[in-house]
């Protein structure tokens, strides 16, 4: 039976890999502030919780508490090095781990769980919510384009087949509303190519099938980004709530900058600097690190390159010395602040969803080199739909290809046009998160669903 309570207790089930848990916690913090009478129990692994709660504990609302659950790795287990091995171990143990965590939270708070909020990857939360008679509110951390491919996964497989796309890579996904410029090659692994039988692929397949059953799906985007996608997803899902972009609502906290990046930028001309970063997960293959280095050296564009220390071994001999006068290679950079600086004129990126919106916030055109997952879809959207950046020709870094991108964005009329499009997009996004904007109204709806549970 469904449950209504004046003392809401929201169980939040996180996916503790990549950058999934942090944006979910960001939403929970907003919800906790908007519904101070509710209690939010946040469940993730100890490693994940330590990384996302540590820096914000002094400002964390008192109605949020984290609970550590098992990572599913048996004691003494030796990893075999299989792709997504850690995800598989976690996923197998997760249903029972989350249940045990909720029992503990109920005992501590004295409140029964009244609502399940979960990362969409935790698809079995649908079954748990049904068993408990609760609303299930999955959070999609990426964009509406990738969400659509999962919701339509069975139709896509029926149309394209699952025996590979060789020779059909550039055919268009024009049978899915809002996806007419997407090519087969842009799809994520696990949709029609890759190991479709892996536990991770099967998990995402099942997720796409059950999302239409959710009480509401909420997402870090805004309705006006793509009317076609928005309207179609509204027709496929019970309730579809765009509540972002998050970085325009709650700017990331200012963190101490020990690398000197921001001071260095003060000495550079407007829109002259190339910023390079591929997120917290990805490093380009060694040959592409070399190609990027050669392009920077030959073009002599000022640059800041956020490169992990362990990847420095792939830099060409003498590169750091030769570029010292106009470039910085640092192990980490305050990305949002760097992209917001007027000196930055281009962003070489993997095209992750969060990085994309930090670039939009700063008005910086993107040079996209996608690697996996939704990144290819995002790159296509950046170049062909939104027209706020370019993709690397051929999909891999080459010296000549990069130099051409630098020239287009920093020196040619195209760069000016991209920046104009970015300004217009930023203005539209700002309206969405404004007092009467669509994202603001949708967030009010989400608060109502979370704090005043109704029939599921």
UniProtKB/Swiss-Prot annotation:
Residues involved in kaempferol binding: 18, 20, 84, 150, 188
UniProt note: pH dependence: Optimum pH is 8.0.
Instruction: Describe what upregulates or represses it.
Output: By light.
- Pfam families found in the cross-reference section: UDPGT (PF00201)
Q: Does the keyword Transferase apply?
A: yes
The pathway that the record names for this protein is: Pigment biosynthesis; anthocyanin biosynthesis
Q: What is the effect of changing residue 375 to H?
A: Loss of catalytic activity
GO BP annotation list: anthocyanin-containing compound biosynthetic process; cyanidin 3-O-glucoside biosynthetic process; quercetin O-glucoside biosynthetic process
Function recorded in the entry: In the presence of other necessary color factors, this glycosylation reaction allows the accumulation of anthocyanin pigments. Involved in the formation of red wine pigments. UDP-glucose (UDP-Glc) is the physiological sugar donor, and cyanidin is the natural acceptor in vivo. Can glucosylate the anthocyanidins delphinidin, peonidin, pelargonidin and malvidin. The flavonols quercitin and kaempferol can also be glucosylated in vitro, but with glucosylation rates 50-100 times lower than cyanidin.
Q: Which family does it belong to?
A: Belongs to the UDP-glycosyltransferase family.
What PANTHER family has UniProt attached to this entry?
Answer: GLUCOSYL/GLUCURONOSYL TRANSFERASES, UDP-GLYCOSYLTRANSFERASE 74E1-RELATED
- What name appears for this protein in its UniProt entry? Anthocyanidin 3-O-glucosyltransferase UFGT
């Amino acid at each position: 039976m469904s449950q209504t309570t004046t003392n809401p207790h929201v169980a939040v089930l996180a996916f503790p890999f990549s950058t999934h848990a942090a944006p979910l916690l960001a939403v929970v913090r907003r919800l906790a502030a908007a519904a101070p009478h509710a209690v939010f129990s946040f469940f993730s692994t100890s490693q994940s919780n330590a990384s996302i709660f540590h820096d914000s504990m002094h400002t964390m609302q008192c109605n949020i508490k984290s609970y550590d659950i098992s990572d599913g790795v048996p004691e003494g287990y030796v990893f075999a090095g299989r792709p997504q091995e850690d995800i598989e171990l976690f996923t197998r143990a997760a249903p029972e781990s989350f249940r045990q965590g909720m029992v503990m939270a109920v005992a501590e708070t004295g409140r029964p769980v009244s609502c399940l909020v979960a990362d969409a990857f935790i698809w079995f939360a649908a079954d748990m919510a049904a068993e408990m008679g609760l609303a299930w509110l999955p959070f999609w951390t990426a964009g509406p384009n990738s969400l659509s491919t999962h919701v339509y996964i069975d139709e896509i497989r029926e149309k394209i087949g699952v025996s590979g796309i060789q020779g059909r890579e550039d055919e268009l996904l024009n049978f899915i509303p809002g996806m007419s410029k997407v090519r087969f090659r842009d799809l994520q692994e696990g949709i029609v190519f890759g190991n479709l039988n892996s536990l991770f692929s099967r998990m995402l397949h099942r997720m796409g099938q059950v999302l239409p059953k959710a009480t509401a799906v909420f997402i870090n985007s805004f309705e006006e980004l793509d009317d076609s996608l928005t309207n179609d997803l509204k027709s496929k899902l019970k309730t579809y709530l765009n509540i972002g972009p998050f970085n325009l609502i709650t700017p990331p906290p200012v963190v101490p900058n020990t690398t000197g990046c921001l001071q260095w930028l003060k000495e550079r001309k407007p829109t002259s600097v190339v910023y390079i970063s591929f997120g917290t997960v990805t490093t380009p293959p060694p040959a592409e690190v070399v190609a990027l280095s050669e392009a920077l050296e030959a073009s002599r564009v000022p640059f800041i390159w956020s490169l992990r220390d362990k990847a420095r071994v792939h830099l060409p001999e003498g590169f750091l010395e030769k570029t010292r006068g106009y470039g910085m290679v640092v192990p980490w950079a305050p990305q949002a602040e760097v992209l917001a600086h007027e000196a930055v004129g281009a962003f070489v990126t993997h095209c992750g969803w969060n990085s994309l919106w930090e670039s939009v916030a700063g008005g910086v055109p993107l040079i996209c080199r996608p690697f996996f997952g939704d990144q290819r879809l995002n790159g296509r959207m950046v170049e062909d739909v939104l027209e706020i950046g370019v993709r690397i020709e051929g999909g891999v870094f080459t010296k000549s290809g990069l130099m051409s991108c630098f020239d287009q964005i920093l020196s040619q009329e195209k760069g000016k046009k991209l920046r104009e499009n970015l300004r217009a997009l930023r203005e539209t996004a700002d309206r969405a998160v404004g007092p009467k904007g669509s994202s603001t109204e949708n967030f009010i709806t989400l608060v109502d669903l979370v704090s005043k549970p109704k029939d599921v």
